[in-house]
């Protein structure tokens, strides 16, 4: 089908490039109408360009086949994008106030935002969102909830997909940064917040010379109450890891159900001082054998 359409488009485009009047396409032939062919020729579009355009175009009143949840990075929110149109359908406010949609400026949303403040009461009004993830049933996406992490401040947010609004933000009590996102176990019993950089546990200070002894990573398993649509902090737990740097963590499925997988970098425990003989950070080393 694509090949037949492409051939018809090529013929039409060639006619347009030759400045010849193209006849109106007959219904069902796959050829472009004359006015559309003229636009394509004027812009120098190839048959593949035109095919890509018509593959993604969605007229008003037509729904996309899929929706994509994209992290907003240091803007601290989540974008909802239609696929294949790639239109932004909604911006979900999460870790930062957004005056234009009233988030963080009323009692209800302010309470949600303040739930993610620092343990000492310092307000956090920004975030760095990474790796959103959907809730699952039997290892398949069920579209009920979306979870998103704040890499900069080690926080987790719960978004209810009945109304596409943030319902809960939690500050990790022991971690300073995360990256492993907010992946879930096969039936969303737990939301898994993976760590990134090792730090002293409990907000204590330790010099880098004590890195191996005092610095640790933590994988946090947040217990999720699906009925309440909230994380139950009292039933959650953490696993202590060596002070490697973790990237992404996710739960196994099917034959690997019951296992958790997390990839690591900087297993050399590099902290600088290469010129003094300390380990080099292997991720950036190029070896010439």
PLM segments and residue spans:
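Repeated scaffold domains used in trafficking and secretory/extracellular systems
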Residues: 51-58, 98-106, 123-138, 174-186, ...
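Beta-propeller domains
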Residues: 71-117, 148-173, 226-230
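A short beta-strand motif characteristic of beta-propeller blades
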Residues: 43-48, 87-92, 120-126, 165-171, ...
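Short, conserved, GDST-rich strand-edge loop motifs in beta-rich repeat architectures
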Residues: 55-65, 131-133, 143, 193-216, ...
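Short coil/turn segments that connect the beta-strands within blades of beta-propeller domains
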Residues: 64-66, 143-145, 187-189, 256-258
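Bacterial lipoprotein signal-peptidase II cleavage site
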Residues: 18-26
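C-terminal motif of bacterial Sec signal peptides marking the signal peptidase cleavage site
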Residues: 13-16
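Structural signal for beta-propeller blades
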Residues: 78, 154-157, 200-201, 219, ...
